[in-house]
């Protein structure tokens, strides 16, 4: 393995090993906790199938996943602390679509006075 990392050997090797560790952690979460998990693309498959929103809609009707619970907990804490009148949600990638809708769903249900855009 030592020859594969060139003159930046230690740093490159550390990055490589950290990436392998994170990939294994992600695989564990997908298999045991939330099948839609991804570090940079949570539920990306649902966003990519957006020619029909049926599958996405069905997932939004399900119970919160463990990852959803963490996201909603943080969102609730921020909403109560900041007390915004308007929340803007950006969806730059398909992997952001599910979480954006899940957050919007939570805000609409629990903070009807907050405008969403």
Locate predicted features.
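A short, structured N-terminal alpha-helical element that caps or precedes a catalytic domain
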Residues: 1-117
């Amino acid at each position: 393995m030592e020859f594969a990392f060139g003159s930046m050997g230690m740093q490159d090797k550390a990055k490589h090993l950290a990436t392998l560790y994170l990939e294994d952690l992600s695989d564990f979460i997908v298999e045991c906790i939330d099948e839609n998990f991804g570090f940079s693309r949570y539920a990306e498959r649902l966003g990519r199938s957006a020619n029909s929103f049926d599958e996405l809609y069905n997932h939004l009707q399900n119970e919160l996943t463990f990852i959803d619970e963490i996201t909603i907990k943080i969102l609730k804490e921020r909403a109560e602390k900041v007390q915004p009148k308007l929340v803007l949600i950006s969806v730059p990638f398909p992997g952001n679509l599910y979480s954006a809708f899940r957050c919007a769903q939570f805000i609409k249900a629990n903070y009807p006075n907050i405008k969403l855009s």
